[in-house]
Amino acid sequence: LRVAKGDITAEQAYELLEQAGLGAWVSQLPKGLDTVLGSGATSISGGERRRLLLARALASPARILLLDEPGEHLDPATADTLITDLLQADSKRAIVLVTHRLSALASADEVVLLGKENQSARIIARGSHSQLLATSNEYAWALAQEESSDE
C-alpha cells in the first residue's frame, strides 16, 4: 500500500484492506500489517493477491479508477459483495468497472452493456441496473444466465 501512498497510516491501511475484503485476513496474519509476504506475494492465493492490488489502487490519489474484473478469483457471492462495497464506499472518484458480474452492478450509477456486431464492439444498452432489467432483453437474459450458473 505504501507504493501507492507512502505516508499511509496503519488505520488507513486497515480501512483500505477492509474495503478490498481483506480485513479479517490481515488480522489473522502472524504479524498483521507487518507480515512480510515475500517477493511477488507467491505465498498467498490469487484472490488475495488480486484484492491486495485493489487495496493499492484504492490507496492511490487517482480521481478515476479503471478496475478490470475486480471479483476475479473469488466465489460469486464474495465478488458481488466486493464490487457492491466498492461502488458504495468511494464517492471521491469515478470508478469505471469492467465485469461479467452483472448482479453486482445494482448500486452502479450507470451500466453500459457492450456487445459484438460484425467483429466490432458496440453499446447494446445503457442505464441503471433496474432500468436495464426493465428495458433490455439482452441484459435481463445475461443476468438470468449468471444467476442460474451461480446456483
Cite the ranges covered by each PLM segment.
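A residue-level structural signal marking coil residues immediately N-terminal to beta-strands
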Residues: A62-R63, R93
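Conserved D-loop/post-Walker B switch-helix segment of ABC ATPase nucleotide-binding domains
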Residues: E72-D85
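ABC-fold ATPase nucleotide-binding domain signature/coupling loops
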Residues: G23-L52, R63, P70, L74, ...
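Structural motif
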Residues: L66-D68, V96
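Hydrophobic anchor residue at the start of the ABC signature
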Residues: L54, V98
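C-terminal portion of ABC ATPase nucleotide-binding domains
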Residues: A20, Q28, T84, K92, ...
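ABC ATPase nucleotide-binding domain helical subdomain, centered on the C-loop/LSGGQ "ABC signature"
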Residues: L1-S39, I83-T84, K92
